Curated annotation (Swiss-Prot):
Belongs to the PsbN family. It holds the Pfam family PsbN. This is Protein PsbN. GO terms for cellular component: chloroplast thylakoid membrane. It is a single-pass membrane protein. The chain crosses the membrane at residues 3-23. It comes from the Eukaryota. May play a role in photosystem I and II biogenesis. Keywords: Chloroplast, Membrane, Plastid, Thylakoid, Transmembrane, Transmembrane helix.
Amino acid sequence: MEIATLVAIFISGLLVSFTGYALYTAFGQPSQQLRDPFEEHGD
C-alpha cells in the first residue's frame, strides 16, 4: 500500500474514534455527570 493510503486510513480512523468517544460522552454513562446550564438558570 502507498503511504498516502495508510495516512488517509489512519486519519479516518482517528476521526471515527473521536466521534464515537464524543457521542459516548454526550449520551452514554458519563453524561450523568454533565451539568445543564438551562436547568441551573431556573426562570
